[in-house]
Amino acid sequence: MSDLARILVSIVAILTTVDLAAADQSQEDLLRQRMAFWEAHAPHCKAGDFDSPTKATTDPNQPCDDGDMTMFNGLLCYAGDERGCQAVIDAQDPESGQWFRSPRIRLLGHNDRGDASFSPDMALGVQLYLVKKGDTERAMKWATWLNGLVYKDFAPWGVNWFNKLTDHNIAWFCLEQYGCVVRPGDAASLGLTFDYLHDKKGMPVLPDGSIRGTAASWVKWEATFMWLSSNNRPGYSQHLHAVDILLRRLINGDDNAYMQEAKDLAGKKENEGNAFFAWLAGKSRAEVIDQTLKRCQAPDVLPKPPLFQWQWERDNHVDPGQLLAYQQSCYWDCIFMAKLLKVQSP
């Protein structure tokens, strides 16, 4: 190759690098601008003195679709959004220690959105908050409340089988229905969370009882439950697996823990375009930003009410006559991604 040819090749390489850098910067700027747009349009649930992130209904008399918000607010808290942290705090009764699905539902005293007042999914959001903030006081109040729940003997035989294995009555997150049960995988996560708060943050030992016995019995099997969760069904079940990976990384202090499990999630065809899964799997910043911008709203492409979707918990399947999840995004899922990417609105 002649000297002139080498010079030309070098110039082309430099120009290409500059163009790519400019493109990346352009995407960064666009994400920052979109962040301001999402912030301006994201719905809030106002109840009593509380003003917290929510999904939305189209009912002006009850505009808050907040039945799952304690989990989503825990995710926002993890990503550094203090509004999410405060919403998780406000969803707990400060006297009893009981946690609810949202601050509004706590004030109401029951879940008018259907189902029980709490669930294993919400417990993941609570644990993200507890570990992120090292809040041993609220953790102890919650554990004490859980431990004091009267055992409900209305569960199927499987729970009674768990009881025999642990020599403890299985614990419950609430008492309204069978879905409140602390399953073995939930117990393993609780065991990891309470062990972390005890070992690293000085939380007292849990009182003897169902929650301590259940958590201690199953925490040793946490790797097995993580493997089982990797086979979860598409949609929200796989999203729960992703949230569990996030929690365990936070506890371990290792952003690369369970990386293969995260890559497996992101690589599934039904999850193509899921920016949260891509971020969790360690995809490049440019790729994650690109996926976020493709599915998060722009001023000229507005979502269609009701804004009731946290799109990262949905796969790409859509039933006839229905919209894709990102087309009905609540905006907070997009704010969550921007916060994960440490982007601030201008």
What are these regions (language model features)?
Residues 1-8:
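Bacterial N-terminal signal peptides that target proteins for export
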